[in-house]
């Protein structure tokens, strides 16, 4: 609950990325009445990021979908995550060769849903919104941001009700994206 709240505050621009890095564990500990020193918070955060970068669980159907997409489309990653973490996760999960570019907060200093990060990604990919499709799991960060810049959007949400965004397709399984793109 507390981790989701601090990330919500980051997306709402109530706090900075630096604040998140420095305060996330202090915030959680304060919620249970424990004060944490800066040194301990830094150590816990460093260990957390190292552990997080080694977590490489793939959603069912990921490899099959990527194998279908790569011959037909140029793929890029647009993430609010830390660049070092995203690249390590991609390397460890075997996904690195599927994607041409990785655009993160660290590389452009803005976060989704800000239009600047979408525009930076499209510039790097040398493409236009009309020729771009954002597939994401966050209505607020991924879908709203993509639609705002004129991209098409697909909301991946296995357990959610149908999207209230009529312009965004909603899929519950990655195989649905393959069917959608191949016209099945």
PLM regions: where:
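N-terminal helical cap/lid subdomain that shapes the substrate entry/recognition surface
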Residues: 1-60
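Short, flexible coil/turn micro-motifs enriched in small/turn-prone residues
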Residues: 8, 74-76, 131
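A short, structure-level motif marking secondary-structure boundaries and short turns
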Residues: 9-12, 49-51, 71, 102-104, ...
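Residue-level marker of alpha-helix boundaries and capping positions
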Residues: 16, 56, 77, 133-134
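Alpha-helical structural context
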Residues: 31-32, 72, 124
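Asp-based, Mg2+/Mn2+-dependent phosphohydrolase catalytic module
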Residues: 39, 63, 67, 78-184
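Glycine-centered short loops/turns at secondary-structure junctions
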Residues: 72-73, 150
